[in-house]
Regions:
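Nucleotide/phosphate-binding catalytic cleft detector across ATP-hydrolyzing
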Residues: 1-155, 174-189, 209-308
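Ser/Thr-glycine-rich phosphate-binding loops at phosphate-binding pockets of nucleotides
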Residues: 160-166
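Short, basic interhelical loop/turn and adjoining N-cap
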Residues: 202-206
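A contiguous pocket-lining binding segment that forms or flanks enzyme active sites
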Residues: 197
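PRPP/pyrophosphate-binding module of the type I phosphoribosyltransferase fold
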Residues: 167-172
Length: 308
């Protein structure tokens, strides 16, 4: 079974299940409540506390355990009850700037483990990951709107994630990996700036969900003064990000500039208010990378079948 997963620094995303925070608590004894997965004699519970940013997600087992959660959720979502072990083909991705150096290691991180047994929701799972295909983030998201990009001689994809903002230049619909990078300008940096400013000026500890509510125009329960600080910091953050891209000789006032990722959805109002981008285009689906991985895998498989 093909399962696509986006291992974000802020959230893990799949096609059929709601995103969940990239955070785990490990225990030697079964904890009370929560989403608890049992693996190799240990108990893992999802938490809203993110794993600290890791450029290399293969340094320990935590992202593998998060992958087990994602696989179980996908199997449950499609009511897949095939013979054990379930053979799984993973489609995953990495930031374009890390892709060349890390793709082999990231694929090997999931492979050669044999049959993996774990329990979630009192159900025993046995899976065998027999294939891993890795693709560049941002390009994968762009694939979901490929028909609108293939006729464009130049398009810039900007993927604003949790810890990084990745960019990739497309020429006639093809990714140019010589013009890509990952900037440490993700929304986690914005959250930290806002929390510090609000704590200093309002003596208030603001939660990230409250920040999200303010930026998305929802009821946050916060004062106008706090909301003003949040919006002002967000506008400055967007201005700094776009200036950083311009300093890298990336043209934002001609050609298509495609914004994707949860951060782009969160900051859409600030991006549209900026005078540094002529006509921003937004991919609203925060699971666009996941869907792109699936499309790329399927296209690759058809190509192999046809002898390409």
């Amino acid at each position: 079974m093909l399962i696509s997963i986006d291992h974000g620094n802020k959230q893990v995303k799949t096609i059929h299940h709601a995103p969940f925070t990239s955070g785990l608590v490990c225990s030697e004894v079964r904890p009370f409540g929560g989403e608890t997965l049992t693996y190799q004699g240990k108990y893992y519970t999802l938490t809203d506390q993110r794993i600290p940013y890791r450029r290399d997600k293969t340094e320990d087992e935590r992202f593998f355990v998060l992958t087990l959660f994602a696989i179980a959720y996908e199997l449950e979502a499609v009511s897949f009850y095939g013979a054990a072990p379930v053979r799984v083909q993973l489609a995953v991705g990495l930031p374009p700037a890390h892709y060349g150096a890390q793709q082999k290691r990231f694929a090997e991180y999931f492979l050669n483990r044999g049959t993996v047994s774990f329990t979630l929701h009192d159900r025993q799972y046995e899976i065998l990951i027999d294939e891993v295909s890795c693709y560049p983030q941002s390009y994968a998201a762009a694939i979901t709107v490929f028909q609108t990009l293939q006729s464009s001689p130049r398009a810039l994809i900007i993927d604003i994630g949790g810890f990084t903002a990745d960019y990739l230049l497309l020429r006639n619909g093809e990714g140019d990996l010589s013009v890509c990078d990952s900037l440490e300008n993700g929304v986690i940096l914005l959250y930290n700036r806002i929390k510090s400013r609000v704590a200093a000026e309002q003596d208030l500890l603001l939660d990230e969900t409250e920040i999200d509510a303010i930026l998305l125009g929802r009821d946050s329960g916060q004062s106008d003064a706090v909301s003003q600080i949040v919006r002002q910091q967000a506008q400055e953050f967007v201005s700094d990000l776009l200036s950083s891209l311009r300093e890298r000789m990336l043209e934002l006032k001609s050609g298509k500039v495609i914004f994707t990722g949860g951060g782009a959805v969160l900051l859409r109002q600030q991006i549209e208010a900026s005078d540094k981008v002529r006509e921003p285009v937004f991919i609203e689906d925060i699971a666009a990378n996941v869907k792109g991985y699936q499309l790329l895998y399927q296209a690759e498989r058809i190509g192999r079948h046809n002898g390409y």
